[in-house]
Swiss-Prot record:
Function: Inhibitor of trypsin and of chymotrypsin. May function as a natural phytochemical defense against predators.
A cellular component annotation (GO) from this entry: extracellular region
Protein name: Seed trypsin/chymotrypsin inhibitor IVA
Site features described as Reactive bond for trypsin, chain residue numbers: 40-41
Encoding gene per record: TI1236
Source organism: Pisum sativum
Length: 96
């Protein structure tokens, strides 16, 4: 009679894909958006429609496509737009 056992070295990898997609509690000030859609209502309802490999740091509802690289979009709505991600003075805000 013999007994065989496998030992698996499991560890938490903080740089894994899922931890990049989920909000990690970063400061909202670090969140950014290049393309923001807002309604004409007062106050406006705005949503970032950027598609990137990860959502911005303050995103609560991030949806990613199963692709390589992943294509993620944040579905949170706010009464404002985040600052532009890239160092350009042109921030695209589209009012519906």
């Amino acid at each position: 009679l013999s007994f065989a056992a496998n030992v698996v070295n499991a560890r938490f990898d903080s740089t894994s894909f899922i931890t990049q997609v989920l909000s990690n509690g970063d400061d909202v000030k670090s969140a950014c958006c290049d393309t923001c859609l807002c309604t004409k209502s007062n106050p406006p309802t705005c949503r970032c429609v950027d598609v990137r490999e990860t959502c911005h740091s303050a995103c609560d509802s991030c949806i990613c496509a199963y692709s390589n690289p992943p294509k993620c979009q944040c579905f949170d709505t706010h009464k404002f737009c985040y600052k532009a991600c890239h160092n350009s003075e042109v921030e695209e805000v589209i009012k519906n």
